[in-house]
């Protein structure tokens, strides 16, 4: 049985009415309008221009043409991690473009958080390597049943892709359509407004964003991407998760429980 791939997922234990706008597959501008006030304020300089209008027209047009565009809740990461809660930023590239089967229904792998997948979806290889590194750093079993990272997001880990939508089965299909300017603006605004954050930049794509952080009081951690193609070139053994917590504690912020599900 295949699920309706255009139907938005409702988060577990959600109030049926409280997050209706956040989880609807609505026009892109409507999803922005439903963001928490703090994010709308930070994003205000990034939106309202011709390039944003063109991006909205593109994404909305792809959906209107019947193309499955993932994720449904484009700004799920921003709903789970308000700007005044952010302590760590992990940058991804673009959303997963595949699907998984949960309870006999086909659903998107992407659900609006970089590297994360919904409960029940098979843990992708890059995320398995992330869990492996955490296990090595903390002396814990690296295998987790779920690849859902919402628990991290609720602790203040912003799991942000630099491109926020993708067509099913077509990796990087929404790259160079305007998302990069939006997320660059968001990263810069966040770095200017929040002190002593940790930015984890894995792989050359994420590391290209380092220029947005120069001269600002943040901890910037760089390593190869956790993909199986590059993880053994320095991601595994990088020590980033302990380094992040050491930085946070030195600056009077609570550590992240990386072992939490």
Give the predicted meaning of each segment:
Residues 2-15, 21-61:
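Polybasic, low-complexity association/targeting segments
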Residues 37-198, 205-208, 213-222, 226-231, ...:
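A polyanion-binding, active-site-adjacent surface
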């Amino acid at each position: 049985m295949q699920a309706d791939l255009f139907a938005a997922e409702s988060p577990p234990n959600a109030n049926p009415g409280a997050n209706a706008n956040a989880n609807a597959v609505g026009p892109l501008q409507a999803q922005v309008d439903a963001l928490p006030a703090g994010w709308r304020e930070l994003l205000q300089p990034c939106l309202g221009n011709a390039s944003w209008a063109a991006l909205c027209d593109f994404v909305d047009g792809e959906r209107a043409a019947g193309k499955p565009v993932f994720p449904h809740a484009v700004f799920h990461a921003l709903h789970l991690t308000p700007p005044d809660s952010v302590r760590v930023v992990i940058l991804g590239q673009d959303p997963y473009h595949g699907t998984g089967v949960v309870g006999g229904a086909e659903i998107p792998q992407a659900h609006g958080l970089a590297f994360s997948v919904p409960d029940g979806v098979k843990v992708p290889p890059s995320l398995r390597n992330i869990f492996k590194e955490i296990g090595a750093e903390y002396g814990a079993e690296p295998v987790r049943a779920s690849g859902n990272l919402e628990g991290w997001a609720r602790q203040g880990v912003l799991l942000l892709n630099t491109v926020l939508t993708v067509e099913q089965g077509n990796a990087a299909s929404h790259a160079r359509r305007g998302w990069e300017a939006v997320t660059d603006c968001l990263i810069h605004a966040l770095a200017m407004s929040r002190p002593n954050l940790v930015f984890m930049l894995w792989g050359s794509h994420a590391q290209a964003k380092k220029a947005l952080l120069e001269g600002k009081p943040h901890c910037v951690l760089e390593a190869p991407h956790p993909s199986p193609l590059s993880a053994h070139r320095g991601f595994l053994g990088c020590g980033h998760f302990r380094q992040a917590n050491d930085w946070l504690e030195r600056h009077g912020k609570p550590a992240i429980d990386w072992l939490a599900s």
